[in-house]
A protein has these predicted regions:
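C-terminal segment of N-terminal export signals and the immediately downstream linker at the start
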Residues: 1, 23-49
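N-terminal export signals
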Residues: 6-29
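Glycan-processing catalytic domains of CAZymes
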Residues: 41-296
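Short non-domain terminal segments
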Residues: 5, 12, 31-34, 56, ...
Length: 296
């Protein structure tokens, strides 16, 4: 029986969710791919007209439903090299930790009982992003309390310390550190969502001199390991527009982009929902990313 894990391996997606963005980040210029050892220059031109190129990817090292990778730096560098060769210029660490598992030795989180990581993945990702001229976005910490309580305000306190220590120890030292990713996934009427995203987004910008701060979109109803649409989570286009207009109104001054997940709706509804997403993003001066991560 083929599992989602097998599928990811066979398609060489490296366990990452793909972010499609027309102008995600220009970067400092195209790298000379002929300089990559053992890597042929690839033609990344789209085979279909008027399509968006895949220019960014999540680094989903600490995940909810996928076992953690056990790669070392050799394997990760090969991954970065291949990603850069096909035109990906932006990598987003989807979260810096989940519950007790963390990607870097955070003094604050270790003091709260988190496990000491065997390797400083954050430092490694930033070094590789520097080497391959890629932009890196840091995903905030997920304590798991939101998933337990439905109240996103729980995530503010730990991230106050995480944001400060990450900027001091990593962000201010690596040229590839391009911004922050608010990793919380929300659905409509999520308790504390607007205040939490605004508080975390503002702190990210304040400490880093205004670096970009994108955030994730709605929790998806089509799960990555299945094909069933959760009918209880269904929402109309009009309702979607009203809810996200309220959210964007409350966060647009500190959040630069929103990456809507594509798995909440059926295929024949994509155009209508995507049109609303783009209209709202334009209204509030935000970027609208397409987070095609469901593999459904």
């Amino acid at each position: 029986m083929n599992t989602r894990r097998d599928f990811l391996k066979k398609t060489a997606l490296f366990g990452a969710s793909m972010v499609t963005a027309p102008s995600l980040m220009a970067g400092d210029g195209e790298a000379d791919l002929s300089l990559f050892s053992g890597q042929e220059r690839l033609n990344t031109a789209s085979t279909v007209e008027n399509t968006l190129r895949i220019s960014g990817t999540f680094l989903d090292e600490i995940s909810h439903d996928i076992p953690h990778q056990n790669w070392g730096e050799k394997e990760w560098e090969q991954d970065f090299r291949h990603m850069r060769a096909i035109g990906i210029d932006t990598v987003i660490m989807i979260r810096s930790g989940y519950r007790k598992f963390i990607t870097y030795p955070s003094m604050h989180l270790l003091g709260k009982g988190c496990y000491y990581p065997s390797i400083d993945l954050l430092d490694m990702f930033l070094r590789l992003a520097d080497k391959y001229s890629m932009k890196f976005y840091f995903g905030l910490y997920d304590s798991g309390r939101y998933w337990d309580t439905g109240d996103l305000s729980w995530e503010i306190e730990d991230n106050k310390y995480v944001i400060d220590e990450v900027w001091q120890n990593y962000g201010s030292k690596y040229k590839s550190f391009g911004g922050w990713y608010i990793s919380g996934e929300i659905s409509r009427a999520t308790k504390g969502a607007i205040d939490a995203f605004h508080a975390m987004g503002k702190q990210c910008k304040d400490v880093s001199g205004g670096l970009p701060t994108p955030r994730g979109g709605r929790k998806k109803a089509v799960m990555a390991n299945g094909s069933s649409l959760t009918k209880a989570d269904a929402v109309s286009v009009d309702e979607h527009e009203r809810e996200w207009n309220e959210i964007f109104d409350g966060i647009h001054d500190v959040v630069d982009a929103c990456a809507f997940q594509d798995g909440h709706i059926d295929y024949d509804e994509l155009d209508a929902f995507f049109a609303v997403n783009k209209k709202l993003a334009d209204k509030y001066g935000m970027q609208c990313w397409t987070n095609a991560d469901s593999f459904d």
